[in-house]
Amino acid sequence: MRVLQAAVVILVSAAPVWPQAARLKTADAVLGRYQQALGGVAAIEKVQSETVRGEVEATGMAAKATFVYQAKPFKFVLRVKRPDGVEITQGFDGRISWVVTPKGASIDRDTAVEALRRDTDLQYALHQPDYFQKLELAGITDFEGHRCYWLHGTTHWGKDNNQYYDVETGLLVGYRFQADRLSPATATQLFQVYRSFGGPLVATTVTSRTGDRTQTFTYTSVSYEPLADSVFELPEAVKMLLK
């Protein structure tokens, strides 16, 4: 799923500490180290479905909402329940991105389908270069209070993207990128508090910041039980829009 203050990543003991002297020279080396920091290629490959539960807080929202996020490769459904009882459901079935609110259903026709597929790639840590025209190591820089390897690239759909990996731990600290919708806005996404729930390490606090608006998802549980394809079927209200 992208705070106005410097972020501190809380790392579990399972995250290896790499010697700073062994400076990495290529984007592939940085990404390979990230895969190992998460728990290794085999652990990442085992994730074929995912259910995440937690809370979300955002600018303009008086209290925290709760959410359930379910995903399989290239599909997802996100259900958010606000403190006032209002429910919002968003999803992607591999082709169509949609949202249903109390005001009705709508289809996202602005975001590139490849961007949506990237966001629902459960093995994205293994496939990152596949989504870029180019992705290169731009150097070492400070990002949100961390000394980071900085990767810079352009996606296949023409968006600028910057990734920051902690020099000490190899873990992803955050992104700074051009939004995937039609807006030219630059967004920042931070990944904090890494934990394992029986699979690869997961950032359990994910904060997205665009301008003066902030949204933070806090994960309380992550499970990898299989999910039926029916979970990701289009709601009837969305199907009506396609007729």
Residue ranges of each PLM-predicted region?
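Sec-dependent signal peptide recognition
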Residues: R2-V9
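Gly/Pro-enriched, hydrophobic low-complexity segments
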Residues: P19, K81-P83, E144-V238
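N-terminal mature ectodomain segment of secretory-pathway/periplasmic proteins
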Residues: A22, A29-A105, Y131-L137
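A short, sequence-level motif marking secondary-structure junctions
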Residues: V68-P73, D93-I96, A112-L116, D166-E168, ...
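Acidic/charged, solvent-exposed loop-and-adjacent secondary-structure segments enriched in E/D, K/R, S/T
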Residues: W98-Y124
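Short, conserved active-site entrance elements at the starts or edges of catalytic domains
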Residues: A115-W150, L171-R176
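Short, solvent-exposed mixed-charge patches
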Residues: L242-K243
